[in-house]
Amino acid sequence: MANEPVILNVYDMYWINEFTSSLGIGVFHSGIEIYGREFAYGGHPYPFSGIFEITPGDATELGETFKFKEAIVLGSTDFTEEDVERIVEEMGKEYKGNAYHLMHKNCNHFSSALSEILCGREIPRWVNRLAYFSSCVPFLQSCLPKEWLTPAALQSSVSQELQGELEEAEDAAASASTPTCAVAPAPRPARHQPRR
């Protein structure tokens, strides 16, 4: 059995936390690290997965407003790396980019759900305290900058997904107008592909 550690990586949205920490509220992003990969979730306006992958603990891939805060070992799992890939892919059906909601379905909700599946443990409550606070102040989500909802790594994934769909449409249009049989090009691997 694998007995692989399940790690919660927490990122500080450092400039806003200078103001909110005195209120006892932090603004945090999180992802789950397993098998040397980190899976996280963010919002975008499209009906495909908002789950993306980054190098564990690398805040630069998320964007300039993020700073790595800490790694918390939540437990361990006997799921294999292939099992984890299937689980994340299946979760992508629920965690679509256009389903992101600050209070009900954010990156921390995803991290907690994945952690529960992998090792039976939720993430610490303090990581997602903003969701509770924003439920008390309903207009808060509309005041937050877009980059809080869509980290840079996810923006890259979305661009790649949309480019792939555009190329598929162009290929389909070209093959429809060409009477000869064409072989579809092999998909290009990308570092930050969204999970379907």
From Swiss-Prot:
One of its GO terms (biological process) is proteolysis. One of its GO terms (cellular component) is cytoplasm. The active site is at H29, C107. Residues 4-148 form the PPPDE domain. One of its GO terms (molecular function) is deubiquitinase activity. Residues 159-196 are annotated as: Disordered. Residues 172-185 have a biased composition (Low complexity). It comes from the Eukaryota. It is found in: Cytoplasm. It is an enzyme of class 3 (hydrolase). Its EC number is 3.4.19.12, 3.1.2.22. Keywords: Cytoplasm, Hydrolase, Protease, Ubl conjugation pathway. InterPro entries: PPPDE_dom, PPPDE_sf. It catalyses: Thiol-dependent hydrolysis of ester, thioester, amide, peptide and isopeptide bonds formed by the C-terminal Gly of ubiquitin (a 76-residue protein attached to proteins as an intracellular targeting signal); S-hexadecanoyl-L-cysteinyl-[protein] + H2O = L-cysteinyl-[protein] + hexadecanoate + H(+). Pfam families: Peptidase_C97 (PF05903). Belongs to the DeSI family. This is Deubiquitinase DESI2. It comes from Danio rerio.
